[in-house]
Amino acid sequence: MVKEMNGNALNVEHDINIHLENKKVSRHFFVFLFLMYAIVYMTKNCFSGALADIVADGVLTKSQTGLITALFYLAYTPLQIVGGIVADKHSPEFLIKVGLFGSAVANAIIFFNHNYYVMLVVWTLNAMIQFALWPGTYKIITSQLCRSDKSFMIFFISIASTLGLLMSYVVAAILPSWEMNFAVSAAALFILTVIMHVYDKHLNRFMIRDYEPISINSGKSTYGGSTFSLFMKSGFFLLLIPVVIRCLVGQGSKTLAPLMLHEIFKTDPSFGNLLNVLIILAGLCGTLLVKLVLYPRIVKNELLGLIICGSILLGFTVAFVFAPTMPLTVVSLCGIALFSTAASLFISYFNASFAKYGKNGTAAGISNAAASFGIVLLNYGILKISEIWGWDYVRYLWLALSALLIICAVGVFFINKGFKKSEKQN
């Protein structure tokens, strides 16, 4: 591979099938992408982070706040599939800038206008403008940055979402009012847009063009079928059920904990947010457990790792159901957060395996769509269940879902094993 001549200089805002081989430049850009996605994830959770304060102040009801977040992910979910396909065909850097700028505008509007219906519409539009932000980020990491660093970059970018979620609750606890969450988010996103644009110009001279696009029929892979067939036969589509469940249970343990503790044990909302920091940090430990201990030293198969983490997750969910006191409830929620996050990283490693077919962006988009659908169910369905029947029903539902996650993960393991065997034979 050679750099383009000056007359045909590469432009990351237009060219695809390009990559960096300069490790220093690649790693610096990744650090920016890591911080960027952490902040983006923080801004996506503005309503969740301030949920207890918004409800306590009487600004919105629990159902109204849940509906705003649910509609965000209801719009976000199908568009992630579109975003994944688009990120495989167009510049992911340009798509990221569109998402950053649009989200900054949405956060600024909500800071100045607290009308419920305005919030509902603007936050839904915010979801739509971010349609390719995550698929674009994942595409850059798994295809454009230095490929020898790919495993570590997938590991660290999974930490970014945990860090972003943690920041959303820390910021909510520190700021004097819930409205300031949106002011801080808007300012941060505007700054990120500018930095991303400057970085794009800087990267052009370091980019190298691939010899040819990596596609299903390029000879890079022995599989010659359609994308749908690839995802079906590899077990990817069945894996989407554990993805949804992981969000319902794992994400629920992080985002609903302050409200749950407030309503069950009458804890102060601010104290609940601080306790939630422990739960989110436990989730971060799950990521570290996978990368530093389990994979690939002890567990060499991503799907086997998912089964192991799902089994331990089920044990902590049982403890959560029968926990009689607040300390035991918090400990069980920490365990749920830890092993659900570990399971999520194994899923990310599995999705990265589709890079050899040129479908890693599509896989990331579809997987993120499934996760977003889980968050829709979490923020409206689970909140509605807690409002009508109470938190005990939520506990038993999470227990049943944790068991279903293991069943589906085992199914995917055997389907994928057969798929790999047939690939080798062909």
What does each model-identified segment do?
Residues 13-23, 204-239:
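Juxtamembrane intracellular "pre-TM" segments in multi-pass secondary transporters
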Residues 47-48, 234-287:
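Extracytoplasmic gate region of multi-pass secondary transporters
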Residues 78-114:
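Conserved MFS/SLC helix-loop-helix module at the cytosolic interface between two early adjacent transmembrane helices
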Residues 79-91, 286-300, 386:
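Helix-to-loop junctions at the C-terminal end of transmembrane segments
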Residues 122-160:
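Cytoplasmic helix-loop-helix junction between adjacent transmembrane helices
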Residues 156-204:
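Helix-loop-helix hairpin linking two adjacent transmembrane segments in secondary transporters
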Residues 300-346:
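C-terminal transmembrane helical hairpin of 12-TM major facilitator-type secondary transporters
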Residues 354-391:
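A late C-terminal transmembrane helix in Major Facilitator Superfamily
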